[in-house]
Amino acid sequence: MANSKRTLFLKRRLRVRNKLRKVNAGRLRLSVHRSNKNISVQLIDDVKGVTLAAASTLEKDLGFVGKNNIEAATKVGSVIAERAKAAGVTEAYFDRGGFLYHGKVKALADAAREGGLKI
C-alpha cells in the first residue's frame, strides 16, 4: 500500500522530533507549525510542559498583510526572538517537525538567529 503525503509527513515529524530529543535533552524547543494560510512558532519547555513564548501570523496587533509568505515568516522569527529575550531565554533547539528546512521555515529560523536567539 502506498503511503499518503500525510502519513509520510507524520513519520518524518516523529523521526525528526525523536532524534532532536535524544541530542537536546533538557533544552528548550522552538517548534514551528506551518499551514496553507499561516505560520506559528512556540518556545516550549518540555521538562515542565510549559510554553514560554509564542508568535503567529494570526496575531492582529502585528499587522500582517500577507500571512503565508517569506516576509511574514521573517517577521514571526524576529518577534519570537524578542519574546524569548523578554522571557530570559537565549538558547533553544529548532524543531522543524515534518516540514522541510526550506523557504518559510528557513526564513523563520534565520530571523530568530538574527534576533539573538541561539539555535
Swiss-Prot record:
Keywords: Ribonucleoprotein, Ribosomal protein, RNA-binding, rRNA-binding
GO biological process: translation
CDD domains xrefs: Ribosomal_L18_L5e
SUPFAM superfamilies cross-referenced by the UniProt entry: Translational machinery components
GO CC, alphabetical: cytosolic large ribosomal subunit
Gene3D superfamilies: 3.30.420.100
GO terms for MF: 5S rRNA binding; structural constituent of ribosome
InterPro entries cross-referenced by the UniProt entry: Ribosomal_uL18_bac-type, Ribosomal_uL18_bac/euk
NCBIfam families in UniProt: L18_bact
Protein family (similarity comment): Belongs to the universal ribosomal protein uL18 family.
Its job: This is one of the proteins that bind and probably mediate the attachment of the 5S RNA into the large ribosomal subunit, where it forms part of the central protuberance.
Quaternary context: Part of the 50S ribosomal subunit; part of the 5S rRNA/L5/L18/L25 subcomplex. Contacts the 5S and 23S rRNAs.
Protein name, UniProt field: Large ribosomal subunit protein uL18
Gene assigned in the entry: rplR
